[in-house]
Amino acid sequence: MWTCVDRDGTLLDSDKSVWFQGRAGWMFATMFNTVEQNPLWLEVAQSCVDFLDRCAAPIDHAEGTQAVSHLLSRRNGEAVPKLYFTVARDAKPLRMRRYYYSESFAAIAYAAMAKATQVDRYHQAAVGMLEVFLRSILDKSKAEPKTDPRTRPTRGIGPWMIAMATAQELRANLGDVAVYGKSCSEWIDRCIEEIDQSFFKRELGVLMEVVGLDGEVLDHFDTRQLNPGHAIECAWFILHESRIRSDAKLQKLGLDILDCMWQRGWDQEYGGLFYFRDVYDKPVQEYWHDMKFWWPHCEAIIATALAWKLTGDEKYQRMHADVHAWSFEHFADREFGEWFGYLHRDGRKSNTLKGSIWKGPFHLPRMLWYCAQL
């Protein structure tokens, strides 16, 4: 799937995002599984998953460049190739990143395809890819750290969030299967515990992105930086789990995170969510800190709708109405459809991009699909 398109769908770059082969594969297969068994949706999902099979690094053994899903169906995450981040049109390698998010998005695509097609190879590939991702979190030798751990060891919330969401999707499509020695539900518990104990700072009213090894706040630009949209996405992952389990404690945790990060992120002057903030309200070094990106608003629409559904509290109805109205007024393109991705603080368009290596059919359709299910 191409994602680098201009406002009217004109192709801007034929390079392909491996993230979006997984994300789009999951989205279209999920629509097929939950909304309508439209053969076109399954065809798109199949195309994305077939392409994913070609996006791994070469491996030095007799099986050569065999499809990733075939390898995973036998190896269960052990000694399997790492997926690229970007590839050329024909899947030739371009860029490999240090982290393993391509693998997590591949896992959810394989899981949704397993449910749609009942092909066991996809079931096993989904389990194997999640195992690869979990190994990257738990074994520090697997993923290169962003900063030298000898000088400043840190931990990030991102892998725990994505592990939680990935385990939720595998459980939804495959059942509560065992992955790397634990059930999906047990991994979800582990992720929520890490987020609650290490990253949520109630005394500061924030969910941190990066902390020290013992959960301490480190007083530097990169480690003081908050991402309200990311934190609000985490909040609804937890609220989603609370709804499945009818768990009041999890619901409170999700609501607490949503409440404090909404306060941190919502722009009282122009509306919309700031991209970055500082834990101590100091200046942020990234020059795009006050811009409005499409995806945090999609996550906030889900989070506020879910909070309203779970509690009936009119506060969340007002928050939902505010972010929904602002988003559809400023991001939506009434002529060509879809959403623009990047706005200045006051809501003016930064450019006309509809898609890129980072923006594709995931956050917006997931928001529309999830809210329609509530």
Feature names for model-found ranges:
Residues 1-374:
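Glycan-recognition and catalytic cores of secretory/periplasmic carbohydrate-active enzymes
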